[in-house]
């Protein structure tokens, strides 16, 4: 964790937003909040124009409410109906804020159900607090006219429930870096890494045991050293990722790729 120059960590809230106002705003009233990251669909999103304008209106109202009490808002356009896009963006913000040494809270109750699931998983994976804002009523039936001011949920009491933190099994840090590299390659249409590429990857990151590359050896020592590194890759890196179903290892003769 990076120590901030000011000495004290900031308090940051991440709020993925659906058709809600109260559930996004009420928990932060009279609280010390240094910044809010507000995630919602883009104003240019390719969806039904009526639904798009409705969401833009909610986003504007929540932003105005928060800024009126001097809470800065950073807006992030996200494909809210895409679980992976939500996971990616929430995780990116969490990692950046934690790296800066800040305290991060994630509101998982101001968005739709699928989005809420993704948000909660991201918060628990990165070990930050997620919370649920209880509704005292809903803008339906005879209360439907209240939606314009409250959103779909009406919050009066402001009861907040901190979700229990469940530990999510995750790979070692270097293996997460390896997964990230595989993902980058996939996005660039080279969705695999050969064994020598993995050796170079671990060597560049100064991973223990990979300080010396095979080509730095001579004769039989070169071949012996390379086999030892390949065995180390399998034991220390690929077995874990295969066991957790992150990768599939393909053997090609004496070589392999993932």
Predicted stretch roles:
Residues 103-109:
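Short glycine-rich phosphate-binding loop at a beta-alpha junction
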Residues 1-103, 117-258:
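Long, low-complexity, Lys/Arg-enriched
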């Amino acid at each position: 964790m990076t120590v901030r120059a000011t000495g004290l960590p900031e308090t940051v809230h991440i709020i993925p937003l659906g058709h809600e106002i109260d559930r996004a705003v009420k928990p932060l009233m009279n609280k010390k909040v240094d910044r809010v990251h507000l995630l919602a669909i883009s104003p240019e999103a390719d969806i039904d124009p009526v639904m798009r304008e409705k969401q833009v209106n909610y986003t504007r109202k929540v932003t105005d409410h928060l800024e009126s009490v001097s809470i800065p808002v950073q807006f992030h356009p996200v494909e809210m109906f895409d679980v992976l896009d939500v996971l990616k963006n929430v995780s990116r913000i969490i990692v950046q804020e934690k790296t800066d040494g800040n305290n991060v809270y994630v509101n998982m109750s101001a968005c739709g159900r699928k989005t809420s699931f993704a948000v909660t998983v991201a918060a628990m994976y990165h070990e930050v607090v997620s919370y649920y804002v209880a509704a005292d009523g809903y803008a339906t039936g005879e209360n439907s006219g209240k939606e314009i001011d409250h959103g779909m949920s009406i919050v009066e009491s402001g009861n907040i429930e901190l979700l229990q933190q469940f530990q999510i099994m995750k790979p070692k840090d270097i293996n997460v870096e390896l997964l990230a590299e595989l993902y980058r390659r996939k996005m660039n249409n080279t969705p695999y890494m050969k064994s020598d590429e993995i050796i170079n990857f671990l060597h560049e990151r100064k991973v223990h045991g990979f300080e010396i590359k095979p080509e730095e050896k001579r004769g039989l020592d070169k071949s012996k050293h390379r086999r030892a590194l390949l065995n180390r890759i399998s034991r220390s890196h690929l077995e874990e990722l295969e066991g957790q179903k992150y990768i599939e290892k393909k053997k090609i003769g004496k070589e392999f790729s993932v």
